[in-house]
């Protein structure tokens, strides 16, 4: 089970195997999501988000062994992102604007998604999903950023062509110091 309150633990125990067709469906959803982001089809990507989306990327700090539970900032603390649908709409408008200096010229990104683990959520048709990612970004001629980490999502089954909507995403990056000039892209 994904621990929604503690970003340091994705699953408390090894998840039970899920139906292979469900595993395939969710992986295909993630590959489609990555394709939309890589191709800068941001409005189509935004359409995959639930109206009650919570998009959260806590700040990571380096801690000694006995303080690892405090490694990531929590709810109601500072975060790189702590966005709802309205804030995400604003980010979408900015990233697609030709006056946004941080994305003009636009970044070239590549999202690699792997290690997808799924457990049933509390409600029918809801799934808690953990996946690992690498996001490669190249901008201008020499700016290169690589981010690695884990995403903890809540997906809901829908009748849409995509089959699911993203209701919650918590992004746990491996870096404690971000060397990138900005975070003007989506994970």
UniProtKB/Swiss-Prot annotation:
Chain coiled-coil ranges: none
Record key words, sorted: Aromatic hydrocarbons catabolism, Dioxygenase, NAD, Oxidoreductase, Plasmid
SUPFAM superfamilies: NTF2-like
GO biological process, one term: 3-phenylpropionate catabolic process
Induction comment: Transcription is up-regulated by aromatic compounds including biphenyl, ethylbenzene, benzene, toluene, xylene, cumene, cymene, and chlorinated benzenes. Is under the control of the BphST two-component regulatory system.
Pathway given in the UniProt record: Xenobiotic degradation; biphenyl degradation; 2-hydroxy-2,4-pentadienoate and benzoate from biphenyl: step 1/4
InterPro entries in the cross-refs: NTF2-like_dom_sf, Rng_hydr_dOase-bsu
Reaction equation(s) it catalyzes: biphenyl + NADH + O2 + H(+) = (2R,3S)-3-phenylcyclohexa-3,5-diene-1,2-diol + NAD(+)
Uppermost EC category: oxidoreductase
GO-annotated molecular function: biphenyl 2,3-dioxygenase activity
Enzyme Commission numbers on file: 1.14.12.18
Assembly notes: Heterohexamer consisting of three BphA1 subunits and three BphA2 subunits. The multicomponent biphenyl dioxygenase system is composed of a ferredoxin reductase (BphA4), a ferredoxin (BphA3), and a terminal oxygenase (BphA1A2).
The protein's role, per its UniProt record: Part of the oxygenase component of the biphenyl dioxygenase system that catalyzes the stereospecific dihydroxylation of the aromatic ring of biphenyl, yielding a dihydrodiol compound. Is likely involved in biphenyl degradation that allows growth of Rhodococcus sp. strain RHA1 on biphenyl as the sole source of carbon and energy. Can also use naphtalene and 4-chlorobiphenyl (4-CB) as substrates, as well as some polychlorinated biphenyls (PCB) such as 2,2'-dichlorobiphenyl, 2,3-dichlorobiphenyl and 2,5,2'-trichlorobiphenyl. Exhibits weak activity toward dibenzofuran and dibenzo-p-dioxin.
Similarity comment: Belongs to the bacterial ring-hydroxylating dioxygenase beta subunit family.
Protein name: Biphenyl 2,3-dioxygenase subunit beta
Recorded name of the encoding gene: bphA2
